[in-house]
Amino acid sequence: MSPRESGETLVVRRVIPVPRERVFAAWLDPKSLGQWMRPGGMTDATAEVDPKVGGRFRIVMIEGPKRYEHRGEYLVIEPPDRLEFTWISEATDHRATVVAIEFLERDAGTELVLTHRRLPASQVDSHRAGWTDIMKKLELLSGSDPGSS
């Protein structure tokens, strides 16, 4: 295995009671990303996306005065089945890690299977917690109806 391919892999799964098309779209919409792509104590997030293969994205997660920038490039966009992108941040030692997400149709909605590869071993637990929290927030947002009280 080359140094570029080295690292750890984690898998996070969650069923969200919303159709695949809607869940998939949430991953490519900057306004939507800014609402749920904020794990743990993050209070806000901003996102810029160019949703095409080879397009880039930038997400800045905000926790008080601190800013955590994440960036990457879309490698695969197959609506509503699969999304794959590089994920680069300070937490990954500014190395390109790879996130692949499968959107599986289930009776209860959509099962997300997120596989994050090439992670530094020291970051597996924190990324597992972060992705789990992000999926919970995505589920809450996806299930909400802005018109309801």
Language-model features: locations:
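Hydrophobic ligand-binding cavity/cleft-lining segments
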Residues: M1-T43
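A conserved amphipathic terminal alpha-helix motif
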Residues: E5, R117-S149
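Short beta-edge strand/loop motif at the mouth of beta-sheet-based domains
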Residues: V11-V12, K31-R67, S149
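Hydrophobic pocket/interface hotspot
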Residues: V23, L33, F57, Y74, ...
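Hydrophobic/aromatic beta-strand elements that line small-molecule binding cavities or substrate pockets
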Residues: R14, A47, H70-V76, W87, ...
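A short, structured loop/turn motif at beta-sheet edges
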Residues: R20-E21, L75-D81, E102-E111
